[in-house]
Amino acid sequence: MDLMQHLYGTGLEVVLVSPRRFQEAQRAVLAVREQKFVVLQAQQMEPDLAQRTIDFVAGGVQAIDGQAERLDATTFLFAPALVRLSHMQPKSIDPPD
């Protein structure tokens, strides 16, 4: 079976995780392991605890060959290994001649 057919055939899922405690971070890693995308929002946490949580999830996702992308100071996107995250740079607009 073609990998792309497999991905599209099963449907992709995005899980939004807004932990209030460090113990909730494991849910994010488990979701990525289940081939789901995770958006982790740590705004509701104290800064030190938020950093610890983000580091834990990023390490867990990296251990299963997933990817991480910072969206803003406290929001991250985590993707499973089968998906490649890429950046689309805006095209520069040339001034009129």
Per-segment meaning from a language model:
Residues 1-46, 51, 55-97:
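Positively charged, small/polar-rich N-terminal and surface patches that mediate targeting and assembly
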